[in-house]
């Protein structure tokens, strides 16, 4: 089967999420904003304490914090942090003694997240421009890695999970919500950059997704379905035909695993 042109994909994803940053009230394949966050399980009282601009740009596919179980003083990395809602939410959970680093490769998203977090006085949050396949962070520097609706956008998911293992301390948690499929996607979908950017074309089969996590040095503690629906008819049709859906995954880095890759 043919594969997606990575350069075209990267350009399309950056274009899509630049628009999300600049026009959060625009029309997209996916739902956004506070109503989505509350339906997925976010605490309304804590949402009230977050920057409104970050909440209105939220485009996640699940509630990772029920799995992450963050506690005061922990170090967290958010892969694909967007405009920063999850990173800011995590900052309130880990407190002033903790630290949250958000990673995103869209410059407009990073700039917006920095402005919003600074205005909210969240000094324990930092946003770095970078790729989730090459996380700009040192080895074994985090207690938990979170990600929400982003890994499906990567053309190299095994590398993402290897990088997550690298930055986690032994016994650290990987708590993610993402898009997977029950059946293989046809070639025309896999090669469609628009459908990748809409969080459909890059959906891995669920069993392949789980195997990639395990191969990176994690023990999968559980996988759960999320209540999530697409907006556009084209996206809904693909979802219905191939079983494209949102799931949440909790995995724990093996105590003996040190991950692979570089240190920064």
Description of each model-found segment:
Residues 120-133:
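Conserved SAM-binding strand-loop segment of SAM-dependent methyltransferases
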């Amino acid at each position: 089967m043919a594969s997606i042109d990575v350069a075209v994909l990267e350009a399309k994803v950056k274009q899509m999420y630049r628009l999300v940053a600049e026009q959060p009230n625009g029309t997209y394949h996916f739902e956004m904003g506070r109503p989505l966050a509350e339906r997925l399980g976010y605490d309304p009282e804590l949402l009230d304490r977050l920057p409104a601009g970050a909440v209105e740009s939220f485009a996640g596919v699940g509630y990772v914090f029920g799995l992450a179980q963050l506690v005061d003083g922990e170090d967290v990395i958010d892969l694909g942090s967007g405009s920063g809602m999850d990173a800011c939410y995590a900052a309130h959970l880990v407190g002033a003694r903790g630290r949250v680093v958000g990673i995103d490769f869209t410059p407009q998203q990073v700039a917006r997240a920095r402005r919003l977090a600074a205005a909210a006085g969240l000094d324990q949050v930092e946003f770095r421009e970078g790729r989730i396949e090459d996380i700009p962070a040192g080895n074994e520097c985090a207690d938990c890695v979170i990600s929400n609706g982003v890994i499906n956008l990567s053309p190299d998911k095994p590398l993402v999970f290897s990088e997550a293992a690298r930055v986690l301390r032994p016994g650290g948690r990987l708590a993610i919500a993402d898009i997977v499929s029950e059946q293989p996607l046809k070639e025309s979908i896999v090669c469609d950059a628009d459908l990748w950017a809409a969080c459909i074309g890059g959906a891995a089969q669920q069993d392949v997704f789980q195997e990639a996590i395990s191969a990176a040095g994690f023990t999968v503690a559980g996988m759960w379905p999320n209540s999530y629906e697409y907006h556009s008819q084209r996206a809904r049709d693909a979802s219905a035909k191939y079983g494209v859906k949102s799931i949440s995954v909790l995995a724990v880095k093996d105590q003996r695993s040190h991950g692979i890759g570089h240190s920064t």
